[in-house]
Design a protein with these regions (language model features):
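Transition-metal
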Residues: 1-130, 185, 190-219, 240, ...
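Short beta-strand His + acidic residue motifs that chelate non-heme Fe in jelly-roll/DSBH
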Residues: 98-100, 166-171, 176-179, 250-252, ...
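Loop-centered beta-sheet repeat module
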Residues: 139-184
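Short glycine-rich, Thr/Ser-proximal phosphate-binding strand/loop in the N-terminal lobe
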Residues: 306-344
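Acidic/His-leaning functional-site neighborhoods
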Residues: 221-275, 279, 286-287
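Short beta-strand-loop/turn "lid" adjacent to the catalytic site in phosphate-handling enzymes
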Residues: 359-395
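Short acidic-glycine-tyrosine-enriched beta hairpin
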Residues: 148-160, 271-289
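His/acidic/aromatic-lined binding-pocket segments of jelly-roll/cupin-type domains
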Residues: 78-79, 87, 109-112, 150-151, ...
């Protein structure tokens, strides 16, 4: 498969605007234009090639890369979103609930702020801990937004929204959203507005009560320089990197994952495909000598695998989150006693692992396992204890 320009599914929703048509080259009758699904294998809106063929019917397993093979659904969906009015206050379920109740993946997502009007912002999580009863009462008496954290935003910022986090995009935001391949949304507040049928849009309060994390939300950002650009968000479902080109940039061959590049500013080319602001291109896994030329920037979406690497020596436990290309995402360490007991070492390995995961917005289920290099005596059977403390994660010792 060659590098291909992508043609998105276009969505008209009542809160949409006209910026994607005016400034990002989208040609569609959809009015207002709320979303363009730049990379989508989802049945509700398939991304196509120039001849109208869905990408999902053309791309082979080899084109997608080996990192996609372990998923029951293609894992990621990339959108551009133009909010001319507030989106509903909503929440998305995690995988376990979504698979049981919706036969779908859940939805963890990431927002890269492409543009924002003065005063624009987002609602993201609760200001303080709430009980489920307090949450339900706030929905009933229409005071929910009083409890939500409003964050003013500006272009270039990035926000990671784990499944179960209540949120809403507000008017004046133009966003590149990288998310799990899911279209499941539970609305809990919609400002009383009516849809095209003249009726208030459906709410999904009971399901939202099941899945919403009502604890105080603390936003975390990720800005990690890599060979390709600046890493902005990671999960087992997607890796999003801000890529800037000023001249020429060669992409290394990647057998493990496709790449999808969404141009958010400037113009140039990706291989033999000319691009400008608003365009997305698909680069198949294993493609050699993909050259980016011009002056532009955007988000590169791939699928990576992540590991916790732990190194024990006589005075410390050092840990890293590492991807399958050997890129170190974050690192940390805990100082230990020279003759620490095994149980203490096990506890500290678990503490350090959780600390590393938290810094990356990762959960245990997002990583492939813990790899331990041990330069002091630690009973190998303790791998079972480490695994149990970390929720069943695979633990291996180097050279075992």
């Amino acid at each position: 498969m060659n590098i291909e320009k992508l043609y998105p599914a276009c969505k008209s929703i009542i809160w949409g605007g006209d910026k994607l048509k005016k400034y990002y080259g989208k040609k569609t009758d959809a009015d207002p234009l709320a979303e363009t699904w730049e990379l989508s294998f989802h049945k509700d809106g398939l991304t196509c090639l120039a001849d109208g063929t869905p990408l999902s019917s053309v791309a082979t397993e080899a084109d997608l890369g080996e990192n996609c093979k372990g998923f029951s659904f293609f894992p990621v969906l990339v959108k551009l979103i133009d909010a001319n009015a507030k989106l509903s206050v909503q929440v998305h379920p995690a995988d376990e609930y979504a698979l049981k109740h919706e036969n779908s993946l859940g939805k963890t997502e990431m927002w890269y702020i492409v543009d924002a009007d003065e005063g624009a912002g987002i609602y993201l999580g609760f200001k303080e801990n709430l009980t489920k009863e307090e949450f339900e009462n706030a929905i009933a008496d229409k005071t929910l937004t009083d409890y939500l954290q409003f964050i003013p935003v500006k272009a270039g910022e990035c926000y990671f929204i784990p499944a179960g986090t209540i949120h809403a995009i507000c008017e004046g935001c133009l966003i590149c959203e990288i998310q799990q391949n899911s279209n499941i949304t539970y609305r809990v507040y919609d400002y009383g507005r009516k849809g095209a049928d003249g009726k208030e849009r459906e709410l999904h309060v009971a399901k939202a009560l099941d899945v919403t994390d009502t604890n105080k939300f603390v936003p975390k950002s990720l800005d990690v320089p890599t060979k390709e650009g600046i890493l902005k968000g990671i999960s087992k479902f997607f890796t999003a990197t801000l890529v800037k080109v000023n001249g020429e940039k060669m992409l290394t061959k990647d057998e493990k994952s496709f790449r999808c590049f969404t141009c958010l500013g400037g113009e140039g080319s990706v291989g033999n495909v000319d691009i400008t602001k608003g365009d997305s291109v698909f680069i198949p896994a294993g493609y050699e000598n993909a050259i980016l030329k011009g002056v532009f920037f955007g988000i590169m979406t791939t699928i990576r695998k992540y590991y916790i690497a732990v190194n024990l020596d006589s005075s410390s436990i050092k840990g890293e989150i590492v991807d399958d290309n050997g890129e170190v995402i974050v690192s940390d360490k805990i100082t230990t006693k020279s003759e620490g007991a095994d149980d203490e070492l096990v506890s500290n390995i678990a503490i350090l692992s959780n600390r590393l995961l938290d810094r990356c917005n990762l959960s245990v289920s997002d990583v492939e396992g813990v790899n331990i290099a041990c330069h002091q005596v630690l009973d190998r059977t303790k791998s079972e204890d480490i695994s149990r403390i970390l929720g069943g994660i695979k633990v291996v010792f180097a050279n075992d």
